[in-house]
Amino acid sequence: AAIGLYQQDGAGNLARAETVFGLKYFLSSQSAILWMSMLFFMSTAFYWLGMFARGEGHTMSLIGSRLAWVAVGMALIGTLVRWYESYLIGPDIGHIPVSNLYEVFVMFCWMTAAFYLYYEQQYGTRALGGFVMLVVSAAVGFLLWYTVVREAHEIQPLVPALKSWWMKLHVPANFIGYGTFALAAMVAFAYLIKQQASETRWYKLAPLWLLGVVLCFEPIVFRQGAAETGGGYWMVYFGISALIVAGILMGRKRIAERLPSFEILDDVMYKSIAVGFAFFTIATVLGALWAAEAWG
């Protein structure tokens, strides 16, 4: 439907993204990705409301789950439309949207959420949604910062080294690994929260608080020098992350009651790590083959 809206006189016209209502506000790649961002933030909020709500917790977490599904859908729409838009700019410019941090962070967000939603269905619990969506929201925060500071949403031609069909295999395989590792890390954090639910000594909880803040800063590792180029933004980001993690620790007893058993948490972690290692191994092999073809 989105691609059809670009058609004018039998040919695609990129300028229609600014004039056609459906494209401008909903289905152009940039609009769809902004909707994805908002929906992931809302999903995170509803999952946590469901965690602490007494009477309507199930309803709140269900809304969080539905919002996450819609966000994944908007991310896929944004990705596919962006791919089409790149060809509208020029046949020689068109490429799969996995060539810069803006594009791969969109992929990271929806892949991480999609894997979590799969496990949510498999194990019949939504209690982990708040934890996993925190790292997705952290990635969305980085994505929005990168969009504003670097105008990364603009489609750029590929550098010669990236003009290879290997990129279509290597990058997605890598980010399946990143997504499942991030999922496993947040489930592990939930495991520790459940394990330390009855702990009252602050010096025992401080390392757990620090770990939670570090996990929120995971997106920075993808961009060298990110902290130096947006100091004010990252200070606010740090403050919000620190408060959120502190709030989780303060409510750890309530959270521990809602979390699934240690056996289920272990199982989700192990399966996520297994998937991550498998795809990371594939990505490493593909990367080596790509490098051999590109540089010999």
Q: What kind of feature is each model-predicted range?
A:
Residues 1-19, 26-155, 162, 169-256, ...:
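Hydrophobic cores of alpha-helical transmembrane segments in multi-pass integral membrane proteins
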